[in-house]
C-alpha cells in the first residue's frame, strides 16, 4: 500500500513542448493507476495562462477535442488551452467510474472516489504545476456526460463550462440540473448535444432541456443542439466545434457584422465597446488577452466614422501599451491632437511615429505626409 502514499509523484515529468503525452497517474483516492493524456500548446509558456479542458472517455474523445482546440486557437477563435483526458475503455471501467445508484441517482461509492480523484488530485496537480487559468471546461459522452453534472452540486462549480453529449441521465437529473443552475450565481456555459434517434433516455433529456430553457438568469448560458444524421455512437463526433463557438464567441476578433450592428449603432463611446469586450474576456477566462490588431483597426475606423475623438485618444494610449514598438500609438495621438486643434503637438506625435515600426496601413510615408501637411498649413 505504500506505493499509493505519494500518488502525484508517480506522474512522470515531461517537457510541455511535447504536445501530447500519455502518462500513468497513481491515485491515492482510487488506489489505482490511471492512464491520463495531456495536450499542451506547442508554444506553451510560463508567461501565459491556459484554460483547462477535462475530457472523460479519452480513448474516443481526446483526439477530437485536441484537434478542434488546435484548429480553433490557430484561427484565433478560442484561446490556447491545456487538454487533459482520462482513459476509461479498458475493462469498460467508465461505467464503474461514473455509475450511480438507481434509486437515488447519486454516485456509487466507486464513482464518489473517481469524483474525488478528478477534483482533489488531478486538477489540483495541474493547477500547481502548470499555468492553468480559472476557466475550466468538462466534456463527457453518454454515462460520462451525466457524471459531469455532479460537479454542479458543489457550492461553487469546479467547471465553468459543460459539454454534455447524449447523456445517460441519472435518476431525477432532469430536474436536479435545472434546479442547480437556477441556484448558482457563477457564470456557467451548459452545452447539451443530442441525436434525433430514439433512445431509452431521450424523453428524460428533453424534459431537462425544456426545464433549463425556462431559466432566464444572465449568468446561465444554455445551448441545445440536436442533429438529424448521427446515431448514439456517431453523435460523439458532433458538436465539439459548435460548443467551442458557443463558449468562446466573445474571444473572437470583432467581425464586420459586429462592427456594423454593435459599434456603429451604439450610443456609447466607440472605445467603450473594446474596453468592455476585453474586460469581459478577462473576467470570464481569468487572464488578460492582448488586444488584437483587427480590433484596434475596427475601433479606429469606428472612431473616425462617428467623429469620436476621445475614443481615438484612448485608443492611442492602448496601442502604446500593447504595440509599443510600432507607430500606431503616436500616429493615433497625432490625429487626435490634429483634430483637437493642437498642430504643434500633433506634429511632434507624428515625428515620433515616424521613428517607429510600420504596421498595417501605417507607414513612415504616411507620417511624413502628415508632417508636411501641418508644416504647409501652419508654416512651421
Show which residues each predicted segment covers.
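The feature captures the conserved acid-bearing segment of alpha/beta-hydrolase catalytic domains
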Residues: 170-231
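Residue-level recognition of tetratricopeptide repeat
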Residues: 301, 335-338, 369, 373
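Alpha/beta-hydrolase fold nucleophile elbow
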Residues: 130-142, 162
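Short coil turns that delineate tetratricopeptide repeat
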Residues: 156, 323-324, 358
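Serine-hydrolase catalytic machinery in alpha/beta-hydrolase-like enzymes
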Residues: 52-117, 121, 125, 129
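C-terminal catalytic histidine-bearing segment of alpha/beta-hydrolase fold enzymes
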Residues: 217-280, 285-286
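A domain-start/cap signature at the N-terminus of enzymes
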Residues: 16-51
Amino acid at each position: 500500500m505504500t506505493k499509493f502514499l505519494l500518488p502525484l509523484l508517480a506522474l512522470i515529468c515531461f517537457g510541455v513542448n511535447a504536445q501530447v503525452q500519455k502518462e500513468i497517474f497513481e491515485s491515492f483516492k482510487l488506489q489505482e493507476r490511471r492512464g491520463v493524456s495531456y495536450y499542451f500548446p506547442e508554444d506553451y509558456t510560463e508567461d501565459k495562462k491556459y484554460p483547462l479542458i477535462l475530457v472523460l472517455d479519452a480513448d474516443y474523445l481526446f483526439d477530437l477535442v485536441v484537434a478542434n482546440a488546435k484548429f480553433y486557437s490557430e484561427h484565433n477563435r478560442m484561446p490556447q488551452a491545456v487538454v487533459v483526458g482520462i482513459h476509461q475503455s479498458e475493462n469498460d471501467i467508465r461505467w464503474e467510474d461514473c455509475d450511480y445508484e438507481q434509486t437515488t441517482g447519486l454516485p456509487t461509492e466507486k464513482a464518489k472516489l473517481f469524483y474525488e480523484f478528478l477534483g482533489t488530485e488531478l486538477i489540483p496537480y495541474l493547477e500547481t504545476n502548470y499555468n492553468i487559468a480559472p476557466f475550466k471546461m468538462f466534456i463527457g459522452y453518454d454515462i460520462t456526460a451525466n457524471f459531469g453534472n455532479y460537479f454542479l452540486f458543489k457550492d461553487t462549480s469546479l467547471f465553468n463550462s459543460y459539454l454534455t453529449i447524449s447523456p445517460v441521465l441519472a435518476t431525477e437529473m432532469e430536474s436536479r440540473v435545472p434546479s442547480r443552475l437556477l441556484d448558482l450565481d457563477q457564470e456557467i456555459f451548459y452545452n447539451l448535444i443530442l441525436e434525433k434517434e430514439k433512445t431509452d433516455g431521450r424523453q428524460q433529456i428533453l424534459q431537462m432541456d425544456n426545464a433549463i430553457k425556462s431559466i432566464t438568469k444572465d449568468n446561465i448560458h444554455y445551448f441545445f443542439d440536436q442533429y438529424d444524421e448521427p446515431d448514439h455512437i456517431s453523435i460523439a463526433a458532433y458538436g465539439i466545434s459548435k460548443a467551442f463557438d458557443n463558449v468562446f464567441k466573445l474571444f473572437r476578433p470583432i467581425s464586420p457584422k459586429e462592427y456594423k450592428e454593435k459599434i456603429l449603432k451604439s450610443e456609447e463611446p466607440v472605445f467603450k465597446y473594446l474596453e468592455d469586450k476585453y474586460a469581459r474576456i478577462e473576467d470570464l477566462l481569468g487572464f488578460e488577452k492582448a488586444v488584437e490588431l483587427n480590433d484596434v483597426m475596427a475601433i479606429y475606423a469606428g472612431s473616425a466614422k462617428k467623429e469620436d475623438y476621445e475614443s481615438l485618444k484612448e485608443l492611442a494610449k492602448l496601442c502604446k501599451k500593447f504595440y509599443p514598438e510600432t507607430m500606431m500609438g503616436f500616429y493615433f495621438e497625432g490625429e487626435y491632437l490634429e483634430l483637437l486643434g493642437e498642430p504643434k503637438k500633433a506634429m511632434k506625435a507624428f515625428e515620433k511615429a515616424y521613428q517607429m515600426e510600420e504596421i498595417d496601413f501605417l507607414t513612415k510615408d504616411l507620417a511624413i505626409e502628415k508632417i508636411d501637411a501641418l508644416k504647409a498649413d501652419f508654416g512651421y
